[in-house]
Amino acid sequence: NIFRKKGKKSRKSKKGDVSAKSDTTKSKNDYGKIVGSETITQEGMFRIHKKKNDYYFEIPIKLLNRDMLIVNKLTKVPAVVNDAGINKGINYQTELVRFEWNKDDNKILVREIQPKPQYPDGDAIGKSVDENYISPLMTGFKIEAYNKDTTAFVIKINDIYNGDSPINRFFPNLNISSSIDKNLSRIVKTKAFENNVVVISELTTHVKEFNQICLLYTSDAADDLT
């Protein structure tokens, strides 16, 4: 049980054990509410759960702090967008990220990994480089549940694919003045593989430059690089 600490028992530690057991029981109950008879599950690098219109990633704790490559690209576009030079196959966002566990807030944070100058081990300039080339946080997710043996956490992913998430931001990366209609955007397909997962979403927008309502299909792939 990852919530329990080893050591000599005392009244204080017993209270901590009770709290840990309570938290673990709650997480298992929450997991059962998400992964039940109505849930469709795909096995892969992450488990992908679909319950009605909600989608979840079940991410193994062992994959925390490992490099993940996120590639977002267009898979279908309407004619008016194609005529403007925005075509199927365009990669509009590529990010190298790591998932981090913020235990205090019970959240998973996503950190964008940015390159920094290399320096020899023990070099005096190393501290300055580390402090001037930090990698920023992009977003965070509430942990909805842990699996039964607490080796993986579950996050809800619907909002990643509404076109306005920092890790799936369509229009700012293509310099188009518009925004996504979240109420008419959705996930349409998911697929889990051994070393990556793919999510296809349908985004709806009114593009001002073209004065038309446009329907776009985007594909998001996350790959484990380690």
Name every feature range the model reports, one short phrase each.
Residues D220-T226:
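A short, hydrophobic C-terminal helix/tail in secreted or cell-surface proteins
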